[in-house]
């Protein structure tokens, strides 16, 4: 498979991971809304710690591993249905499941604007990290570039959620995003050398608040 020139790869990543790409990411907080409600995240420092934990040892790390596995299987004609089923099984709550599956299906539909054989190899209902990873691989985009952009978009979406929840303002948000760049790059490097045996995590509080959010009385987000 021929790799895309870096300029084309950059343009595609900017389009696919833009807030304007129609996957509905603005509707999800990944449990952050409940963490704010419970006082676990209250300012820029606690928000940074929360998001770093997700990517180092929580759902963000698992998504990175699954992204890489999907990228590799897209490149070598591997079984994408298997990794898609695993990713779905790892969604630990009803709302986390909806968040990843609905965004994945929306991404698959929208990415049809860039025709590629990998689209037909993905199940119609597929976790977001698997869909993006496989389509990036199928389009010849370098793994670490694609995953770094995916992780930074993950940070960006949750920082935007934090703004709407009143935790940080615009200036603090941009400072946080700039500060997350080294973590996105180092995590992409680490995950690029991972296998499915590296799946796992210990961000249990994040998983608990994702479940608690299902019964939260007043809320802005779907997760």
Swiss-Prot record:
Superkingdom field: Bacteria
Alphabetized GO MF terms: nickel cation binding
Keywords: Chaperone, Cytoplasm, Nickel insertion
GO cellular component: cytoplasm
InterPro entries attached to this UniProt entry: UreF, UreF_sf
One of the Pfam families matching this protein, by short name: UreF
Location of this chain's protein in the cell: Cytoplasm
Function according to Swiss-Prot or TrEMBL: Required for maturation of urease via the functional incorporation of the urease nickel metallocenter.
Quaternary context: UreD, UreF and UreG form a complex that acts as a GTP-hydrolysis-dependent molecular chaperone, activating the urease apoprotein by helping to assemble the nickel containing metallocenter of UreC. The UreE protein probably delivers the nickel.
Family in the record: Belongs to the UreF family.
Protein name: Urease accessory protein UreF
Organism: Mesorhizobium japonicum (strain LMG 29417 / CECT 9101 / MAFF 303099)
Gene that encodes it: ureF
């Amino acid at each position: 498979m021929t790799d895309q020139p870096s300029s084309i790869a950059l343009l595609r990543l900017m389009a696919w991971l833009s807030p304007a790409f129609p996957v509905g990411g603005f509707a999800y907080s990944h449990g952050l809304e409940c963490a704010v409600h419970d006082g676990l995240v209250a300012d820029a420092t606690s928000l940074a710690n929360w998001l770093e934990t997700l990517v180092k040892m929580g759902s963000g790390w698992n998504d990175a591993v699954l992204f890489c596995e999907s990228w590799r299987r897209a490149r070598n004609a591997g079984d994408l249905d298997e990794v898609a089923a695993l990713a779905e099984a790892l969604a630990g709550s009803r709302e986390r499941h909806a968040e990843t599956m609905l965004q994945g299906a929306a991404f698959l539909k929208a990415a049809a604007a860039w025709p590629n054989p990998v689209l037909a190899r993905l199940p119609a209902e597929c976790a977001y990290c698997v869909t993006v990873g496989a389509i990036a691989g199928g389009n010849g985009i370098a793994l670490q570039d694609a995953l770094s952009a995916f992780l930074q978009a993950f940070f960006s979406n949750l920082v935007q959620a934090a703004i709407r929840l009143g935790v940080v303002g615009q200036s603090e948000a941009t400072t946080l995003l700039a500060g997350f760049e080294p973590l996105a790059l180092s995590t992409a490097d680490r995950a690029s050398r991972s296998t499915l045996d590296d799946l796992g995590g210990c961000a249990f509080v994040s998983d608990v608040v994702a479940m608690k959010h299902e019964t939260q009385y007043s809320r802005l987000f779907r997760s």
